[in-house]
């Protein structure tokens, strides 16, 4: 039932597998620490081949503009998160786990610093980087900063001292993307779109 619920929330097969792996590890540790005998109900759960593991296609430019316009019209925290990612191509967990101090607007070039935090790790060491804030991402950063003045986190809806709720954000935002521009696109698609946008202007590969 939990597996089916995950799919109903819009998660793809890879996301559901990661969720189950995390829960399975937690239960295994708890059973060992407390000497609980028996089997882990999350071990060996059947995962159907849904054919959605590779649906991360780039978002066409027209659809990208539609998304950004909807974000600015709706103007709420989930849409600021989408807008920030749309022109930076950050991973969702990277963006959702940002601290307010990671946003630097008073520099010659406004930018966001991607770095690890106690509540959110980065995927790899090479994931630490600085990204310019332009276009819709700059608007989103300004709006999120203005609204989160009471919190150390840029997106307090998705982040607190206990961790970053990237999985729940992913499910909700993927569902919103589907409602906005149709099937076949997920939050990770913004990374593929940025790759194509950079190639279109002959950006050096090392960038």
PLM regions with names:
Residues 117-118, 134-183:
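Active-site/catalytic core of tyrosine-dependent DNA strand-transfer enzymes
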Residues 1-29, 43, 174:
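Short, Lys/Arg-enriched alpha-helical recognition elements, typified by the DNA-recognition helix
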Residues 13, 17-22, 36-98, 126-127, ...:
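Basic, Lys/Arg- and aromatic-enriched nucleic-acid-binding interface segment
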Residues 31-41, 104-107, 145-148:
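Proline-centered turn/helix-capping motifs that create local helix->coil transitions or kinks
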Residues 102-109, 183-184, 201-207:
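Short, polar N-cap/turn motifs at the start of nucleic acid-interacting alpha helices
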Residues 29-32, 83, 87, 93-94, ...:
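C-terminal catalytic core of tyrosine-transesterase DNA break-rejoin enzymes
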Residues 53, 78, 108, 127, ...:
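Exposed loop/turn and edge beta-strand positions of beta-sandwich/beta-sheet ligand-binding modules
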Residues 44-47, 97-143:
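Conserved tyrosine-mediated DNA breakage-rejoining catalytic core shared by Y-recombinases
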């Amino acid at each position: 039932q939990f597996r089916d619920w995950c799919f109903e929330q819009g998660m793809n097969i890879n996301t559901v597998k990661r969720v189950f792996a995390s829960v399975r590890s937690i239960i295994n540790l708890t059973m060992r620490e407390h000497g609980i005998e028996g089997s882990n109900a999350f071990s060996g759960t059947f995962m159907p081949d849904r054919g959605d593991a590779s649906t991360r296609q780039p978002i066409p430019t027209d659809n990208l503009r539609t998304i950004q316009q909807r974000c600015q019209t709706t103007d709420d925290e989930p849409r600021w998160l989408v807008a920030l990612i749309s022109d930076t191509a950050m991973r969702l967990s990277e963006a959702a786990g940002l601290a307010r101090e990671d946003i630097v607007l008073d520099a010659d070039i406004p930018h966001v610093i991607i770095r690890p935090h106690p509540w959110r790790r980065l995927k790899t060491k090479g994931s630490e980087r600085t990204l310019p804030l332009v276009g819709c991402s700059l608007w989103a950063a300004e709006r999120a900063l203005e609204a989160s003045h009471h919190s150390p986190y840029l997106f307090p809806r998705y982040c607190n001292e206990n961790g970053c709720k990237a999985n729940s954000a992913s499910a909700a935002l993927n569902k919103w993307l589907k409602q906005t521009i149709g099937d076949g696109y997920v939050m990770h698609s913004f990374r593929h779109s940025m790759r194509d946008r950079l190639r279109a202007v002959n950006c050096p590969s090392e960038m």
